[in-house]
Structures are given as C-alpha cells and as structure tokens.
Amino acid sequence: LVGSEMCIRDSESTGLTDEETDALQSEILNETQDIELPNNSNVYNILLIGVDRRDKTWYGNSDSMILMSINKDTKQIHMTSFMRDLYANIPDVGVKKLNAACAYGGGPLVVRTIEDNYKLPIDNYASVDFDSMIDIIDAVGGIELSPSDDEVRVANNYINEMCKLRNADASAHQYTSSGDQHVDGYQAVAYARIRYVGNSDYQRTERQREVLSKMMQEMKS
C-alpha cells in the first residue's frame, strides 16, 4: 500500500530482537500491495470488519478488513483490503498480526491500529460476524456468483461447519455445481472464506470484495 508506513518501534518496547524487527519489516514490504489508498477531504472512509468467532463471549479475530472509500464528489466507491496476516503495532499490545487487533479490543482497536500504522483517517466502521452476514445476504435475496469446481469443494466444507453451529440443514445450502448461479447467505459467506484455492489470502480478499460488491448491487436493485 503506497504511502502506508507500518510502524514497528524499537525492540525494547516490542519485546523483539533487532533481527526479528528487521524480518517483520521485510515481510511487510514483501506482502504489501502497490495500491494508493484514498486519503483526502473529499473521501469518506468506512472500515468494514468481518469477524470470525464461534461464540459471542469474545470479540473474535477479524477475518476480513475492507476499507470502503466513498468519493463525495464523484460518488465512486473504492474498496481496499488489508491483509489479515500482516504484522502491525497494535496500540497497548505490541507487534501482532493485524487480525489480532479485533480480539484485543474489537472494532475500535482495529480502527486505531490501521489509523496508526497506515497514517490513514477512518471516519466510521461496521463490524459483522459470519452469522449476521449470512442473514444480511439472505435478506437481500442472495447474490450472483460463479465459483470454480475447487471453490465449490472447499465452500461446501465451510457450509457444513456453519450449518452445524446454527443447527441448520446443510443439505439445503450445499453447492451442487460450479459456474454461474444465484447463491444464498451460507453459500456466499462460505465462498468469501475460501483461502487455499488460488493465490492464498490475496484471492480470498478478492472474493470478499466480490461478495460485498454483489451484495451492494442487490441492495440497490
């Protein structure tokens, strides 16, 4: 992310050796995509946080962090994903993976961590877990997706897991084929969670933005 300087402080404050700090800095530079973040007075930045938690007793890790930047002049929307496995200096915690900020302090700490590390103002945020996302997508009537054979195979495993947690009938929500189709909330969320098909987490963030974009299209129609 061009113009975003990940802040890692001295080894005394983080508990890391100089070698470990240098290694983290190198990983950040290697894994950071070359994208210009919207950052001016005409842009309204909303951080969308997708939370992975199995129960309601803790905040959970942030499985997805997408900055939705709305240009107030052109009305265009730009979406930028933050990679969950990047290391960041979490305020009052130390250097951890970026997705851990949510577990330590919920949405407010995720916002503060991204603002501090990326020097980026965030005007508001919204946080949603898998359960809520399933219900939201079902409420808009589902979305259009075109999963591959490999994506269908992995997504069905996630569907089984989510249906078990929600006491739902997995057979009613399983993908039965690949290709263009209208999917429900379970299928869409499972698709967005896929990580080990394609280019690892980079392609997962693409799927997450795709699902979000398709959902917004349905809401406008």
Identify what each model region corresponds to.
Residues 4-221:
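Non-catalytic, solvent-exposed segments at the cell envelope interface
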